[in-house]
Regions:
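A short Gly-Trp-Pro
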Residues: 5-132
């Protein structure tokens, strides 16, 4: 995360701003346990935003049930996300992070529903939800 994102903090500041689990996932590129987040079952109309900087990321209309245990979306809000290649665990995946603060959110896969065919598999602990 060497890129100068609009929202920047020292690692010490991030540790103060985030819960230990959020820090481990969002700054340490971790993954929460599947099925562990209440946002997995969130069905109300609203918007999902970055838990680290409040950047709007996904509209609830783009959320779908993937059966994976993590909140899944087929299309982000334009300009909200950036991607990079993740080569950890002897795999090659596309990592998704917040375009505003660089925090790790999850991964994107090409096995989602039409029309995008994409599945943004996002750690629920990295999200906040605001109903509309």
């Amino acid at each position: 995360m060497d890129k100068p994102y609009p929202v920047r903090h020292t690692e010490e500041e991030w540790r103060r701003l985030l819960t230990p689990e959020q820090y481990q996932v969002m700054r340490g590129h971790g993954t929460e346990a599947p099925g562990s987040c209440a946002l997995l079952r969130e069905k109300r109309a609203g918007r999902f935003s970055c838990a680290a900087c409040a950047q709007p990321l996904f509209d609830s209309k783009r959320k779908f049930e993937s059966g994976t245990g993590w909140p899944s979306f087929d299309d982000p809000i334009e300009g909200a996300l950036e991607t990079s290649i993740d080569r950890s665990f002897d795999m090659v995946r596309t990592e998704v992070h917040c375009a505003n603060c660089g925090s790790h959110l999850g991964h994107v896969f090409d096995d989602g529903p039409p029309p995008t065919g994409l599945r943004y598999c996002i750690n629920g602990v990295a999200l906040n939800f605001t109903p509309t």
